[in-house]
Amino acid sequence: MGKLDKKQLIESLKEMTIVEIDEIIKAVEEAFGVTATPIVAAGAAGATQEAASEVSVKVTGYADNAKLAVLKLYREITGVGLMEAKTAVEKLPCVVKQDIKPEEAEELKKRFVEVGATVEVK
């Protein structure tokens, strides 16, 4: 038997019943040691991975004696003025940075926790 190209293979499959195609799929899985998985499952896994690649950091609270330190750190990271930083820190929760890599988010969280803030990474 000669080698089939894609077009010939598809034409052959069009002439088969669903049962025959299912038998071919099982034979291919067995011959190559693979499993046919739905495309939807692969797409969903990719979407989950993509969603986790960008996160946001929010300050959700701070200790009574940590307000000034949180305010200074917020200004340092965001580059906003004193009044903007004060307003943001007093109206919690406030987003510090968004759409950043998880590694950067964890570093920011660590810095805020060190000065007495409660932080959420999503």
Curated annotation (Swiss-Prot):
Pfam families: Ribosomal_L12 (PF00542), Ribosomal_L12_N (PF16320). Keywords: Ribonucleoprotein, Ribosomal protein. Signal peptide: none annotated. GO terms for cellular component: cytosolic large ribosomal subunit. GO terms for molecular function: mRNA binding; structural constituent of ribosome. CDD domains: Ribosomal_L7_L12. The keyword Transmembrane does not apply. One of its GO terms (biological process) is translation. InterPro entries: Ribosomal_bL12, Ribosomal_bL12_C, Ribosomal_bL12_C/ClpS-like, Ribosomal_bL12_oligo, Ribosomal_bL12_oligo_N_sf. Homodimer. Part of the ribosomal stalk of the 50S ribosomal subunit. Forms a multimeric L10(L12)X complex, where L10 forms an elongated spine to which 2 to 4 L12 dimers bind in a sequential fashion. Binds GTP-bound translation factors. Forms part of the ribosomal stalk which helps the ribosome interact with GTP-bound translation factors. Is thus essential for accurate translation. Belongs to the bacterial ribosomal protein bL12 family. NCBIfam families: L12. This is Large ribosomal subunit protein bL12. The gene is rplL.
